[in-house]
Amino acid sequence: MTREDIIQAIKEMSVLELNELVKACEEEFGVSAAAPVAVAGAVAGGAAEEKTEFDVILASAGANKIKVIKAVREITGLGLKEAKEIVDGAPKTLKEAVSKEEAEDMKAKLAEVGAEVEVK
């Protein structure tokens, strides 16, 4: 398997599959994918600029889990099994690096069905 084959396989993965891959690599090689602390300090200095990309995080499914699963499927385009895994495993990141408008729209749809959502 060539490097290009590996990259192509990664490109075809969903966010959920990529998250599982990162966790498996961390466990297998005893490393962490977290950014070094020095980098986080440098980013904090530029935080005065307005943020343009946001992460949408499902904090809790609330009481109406079935409606939340349907909303997650609609928002992410995932299958029933994957959407259920995300809802059952909350808190989970639904989408990363989306516009403020898209993040607020997702938050509104999920809040409408009773989910607790964070936009970071």
Swiss-Prot record:
> What is the species listed in this Swiss-Prot or TrEMBL entry?
Clostridium botulinum (strain Eklund 17B / Type B)
UniProt protein name: Large ribosomal subunit protein bL12
- PANTHER family attached here? 39S RIBOSOMAL PROTEIN L12, LARGE RIBOSOMAL SUBUNIT PROTEIN BL12M
Q: Which UniProt keywords apply?
A: Ribonucleoprotein, Ribosomal protein
Describe its partners and assembly state. Homodimer. Part of the ribosomal stalk of the 50S ribosomal subunit. Forms a multimeric L10(L12)X complex, where L10 forms an elongated spine to which 2 to 4 L12 dimers bind in a sequential fashion. Binds GTP-bound translation factors.
Entry's InterPro entries?
A: Ribosomal_bL12 (IPR000206), Ribosomal_bL12_C (IPR013823), Ribosomal_bL12_C/ClpS-like (IPR014719), Ribosomal_bL12_oligo (IPR008932), Ribosomal_bL12_oligo_N_sf (IPR036235)
Family designation = Belongs to the bacterial ribosomal protein bL12 family.
* Superkingdom of this protein's organism: Bacteria
Pfam families from the UniProt entry: Ribosomal_L12 (PF00542), Ribosomal_L12_N (PF16320)
Any GO BP: translation
Role of this protein: Forms part of the ribosomal stalk which helps the ribosome interact with GTP-bound translation factors. Is thus essential for accurate translation.
Q: Name one GO molecular function term.
A: structural constituent of ribosome
Kindly indicate whether the keyword Ribosomal protein belongs to this entry.
Answer: yes
Please name the Gene3D superfamilies in this protein's record.
Answer: 3.30.1390.10, Single helix bin
* Cellular component, GO annotation: cytosolic large ribosomal subunit
